A protein has these predicted regions:
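Catalytic alpha/beta core of large soluble enzyme barrels
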Residues: 65, 69-73, 82-89, 94-234
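Core structural elements
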Residues: 1-11, 169
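Cys/His-rich microdomains that often coordinate metals
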Residues: 260-264, 280
Length: 284
């Protein structure tokens, strides 16, 4: 977390060519350092078992195949040579979590994301909206009293001000140096069509991303993040579910005592109705 803050402190715009070049250098350093450490651990404690064969010849073949994969081909020569000679301690080393709650708690940008806005509302667990103000804006204005919130530099850019293509560019730049999947949302404006969303996924795939999430603004009835503190209201009448007492255990294959339509089957370790999906008993 804190990537957007770092770019702002360095005066580089999130999603720009200059910003992506800077991000690429950061994640390259992280990846190389992580793999160097894992090779050192392999020297001390032994290699990841899947890179150890029944004999030296098979071991070398496994390691050669590993360093010839797409990700490892991007690694510096000394990393590839180290893996070939000593193996590597870890099967995977890098990933990026969303850190939505922890980033907000510590007052920095979350995960790899830009700020959703520099002032917004976040839906809490109790359904109430909490106002979030980015501390980095106040810090900047304290150092530059001649400016106002309406006169921030161009590198103070929020998620909805970026194009989906710029979001994709950042994710694919980072994915180049991350050997597992990463959490990143491509924000799209209201009215984004199905074909446009499909193109975003194609761009992610062709750019080497292992996964992707596209969120079209306003596509859900309620949102976790919003620029307005509009409480979610229930418009439908909610009726309490009937309480049914089951005194005798129900065996697999018997009629469901709740809906009287489905049968009880063992699904995922639980006695579950095939019709109403109620779980009467779980082995766990």
């Amino acid at each position: 977390m804190g990537l957007a803050d770092l770019l702002i402190y360095c005066g580089k715009k999130y999603g720009s060519a200059e910003g992506n070049q800077f991000v690429d250098q950061i994640f390259e350093a992280m990846a190389v350092t992580a793999y160097e450490a894992s090779i050192e651990l392999a020297k001390e404690k032994g290699s990841f078992p899947f890179l150890i064969g029944k004999n030296d010849q098979e071991t070398q073949a496994l390691r050669k195949k590993f360093i010839d994969t797409g990700y490892m081909k991007k690694m510096p020569a000394h990393i590839r040579e180290g893996v070939l000679r000593f193996g590597i301690r870890n099967s995977h080393l890098l990933t990026v979590a969303p850190t939505g709650s922890t980033g907000t708690m510590t007052g920095v940008s979350t995960g790899l994301e830009p700020y959703y806005s520099f002032s917004y509302f976040r839906s809490g667990r109790l359904g109430k909206f909490i106002e979030i103000n980015a501390e980095i804006v106040d810090e900047y204005l304290m150092d530059h009293p001649e400016r106002t919130k309406a006169e921030l530099p161009a590198w103070f850019i929020s998620a909805m001000e970026l194009t989906p293509e710029e979001h994709v560019g950042v994710q694919c730049t980072i994915q180049r140096w991350v050997d597992s999947s990463i959490s990143k949302t491509v924000n799209a404006p209201k009215g984004y069509t199905v074909s446009q969303v499909a193109k975003v996924y194609r761009d992610l795939y062709e750019g080497g991303a292992k996964g992707g999430t596209v969120y079209v603004d306003g596509s859900r009835d309620s949102q976790v993040l919003t620029l307005e503190a509009v409480e979610n209201e229930l418009t439908a009448q909610v009726e309490p579910l009937p309480v049914v007492q089951v005194n005798e255990p129900v065996a697999s294959g018997e009629i469901c005592p709740i809906c009287h339509e489905g049968t009880i089957e063992e699904i995922g370790g639980c006695s579950t109705c095939t019709n109403c999906k109620i779980q009467l008993k779980c082995g766990l």
